[in-house]
Amino acid sequence: LKEELENENSSYIIGKINNEIIGFAGLKKIFDQADIMNIVIKKTYRNQGIGTLLLENLILLAKDLNISTLFLEVNKQNKPAIHLYEKLGFEKLGVRKKYYNNNNGIIMKKNLQGF
């Protein structure tokens, strides 16, 4: 993560409550596109809408950075994350076979033009 934070093409947002870091989300820009690298929420704060807020703000940051398309990959078994991504307009693009040991990864994208 330290390497990611020091990369000039990476941007991260941090969620805090009372100065406690409860989550973060980041992307890596590649020309006019970006890969979402992380969305992490502390276990005790999950299912409270914080992941949605972080991802919504990451999308706004991407727009400010003139990013036209966001990509991500997610474990096929991570149903809550897939639901969140679909709720925010990400579409399934493809599958990475056995990307997570024996589980497939799902590649998703969101076009930001006209968003």
What are the functions of these language-model segments?
Residues 19, 23, 49-51, 89:
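Conserved phosphate-binding and hydrolysis motifs of nucleotide-dependent enzymes
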